[in-house]
Amino acid sequence: MDAAFHEALARGIEALGLPVDAAARALLERYADRLLAWNRKVNLTAITAPAELAEKHLVDSLVLLPFVAGARTLLDVGSGAGLPGIPLACVRRDLSVTCCDGVAKKIAFVKAVSAELDLRVRGVAVRAEGHPEREGLPRADAVVSRALADPDRWVPLGARYLADGGTLLAMLGREVDRAALDAAGAAEGLTLVGLDVYELPVSHAARAVARWQRK
C-alpha cells in the first residue's frame, strides 16, 4: 500500500480516537491489499484508490469499535467483501464474526482472506431474510449492516438475529430523524439507545450510527 493509504488510515484512526494498535494496522493493510487484488477479477468494491479505501471502508467500519466493545459475537448482514466485519475482527481478535451475503463470490473472498489473516470470521453465502436457524446464521450480541441503511427495512430484519441483551446497529450515510428511528425500533420491541453523528476526517463525508436494544 502507498503512503496515501497509510496517511489516510492513520489520520482517520487518530481523529476519531480509535483503539487500533500496530498489529491491527498491519492486518488492515493486508486485508486492503487482498481486496484490491481480488477486485481486479471479481467485482468487490467500486472504491479502488488506496487512500479512499482506507477512509471509506476501513476507518468507517472501525467507527463501530466502541459500540461493540462488550460483544463476543457479531453478525454482519449484507457484508459484501466483509465490511464492516473483517476490519472489526482485525482489531478485536477475540470477536467471533459471521459475515453473510447472497453473492457467493463475495463470500469466497471473505473466507479466503479471513483464513489468510487467521481471523475469527466465518463467511456464509446466504441472503438474510429473517430465519436464522434455516439460514445457518447465529443470533449475535451485535448485529450490523452497511448495506441496508433504511431503518424501516433493516430494523425488522436485523432484530430477528439479536441475542438476548444484544445491540442492533445501523450505519447511515446521513443523520436520520430520531423520531423515525424511535418508531422503527418500537415496532420491534426495541429501544433506540444512541444516535451518534460523525464526519470522516479526510473527505468530510457525514455519517451516523444508530443503536437499538431490546426493552
Curated annotation (Swiss-Prot):
Which InterPro entries does this UniProt record tie to the protein? rRNA_ssu_MeTfrase_G (IPR003682), SAM-dependent_MTases_sf (IPR029063)
Annotated EC: 2.1.1.170
Instruction: Describe the reaction catalysed, as an equation.
Output: guanosine(527) in 16S rRNA + S-adenosyl-L-methionine = N(7)-methylguanosine(527) in 16S rRNA + S-adenosyl-L-homocysteine
User: Transmembrane residues, as ranges?
Assistant: none
Cite the entry's keywords alphabetically: Cytoplasm, Methyltransferase, rRNA processing, S-adenosyl-L-methionine, Transferase
- Provide GO CC annotations from the record: cytosol
Query: CDD domains, from UniProt?
Result: AdoMet_MTases (cd02440)
What is its EC class? transferase
- What is a single molecular function from GO for this protein? rRNA (guanine-N7-)-methyltransferase activity
Q: Where in the cell does this protein reside?
A: Cytoplasm
Coiled-coil ranges (or none): none
Q: What is its main location?
A: cytoplasm
Q: Keyword Transmembrane: yes or no?
A: no
Residues annotated as binding S-adenosyl-L-methionine: 78, 83, 128-129, 146
User: Which HAMAP family does the record associate with it?
Assistant: 16SrRNA_methyltr_G
- Role, per record: Specifically methylates the N7 position of guanine in position 527 of 16S rRNA.
PANTHER family reported for this sequence: S-ADENOSYL-L-METHIONINE-DEPENDENT METHYLTRANSFERASES SUPERFAMILY PROTEIN
Family (UniProt)? Belongs to the methyltransferase superfamily. RNA methyltransferase RsmG family.
Q: What is this protein called?
A: Ribosomal RNA small subunit methyltransferase G
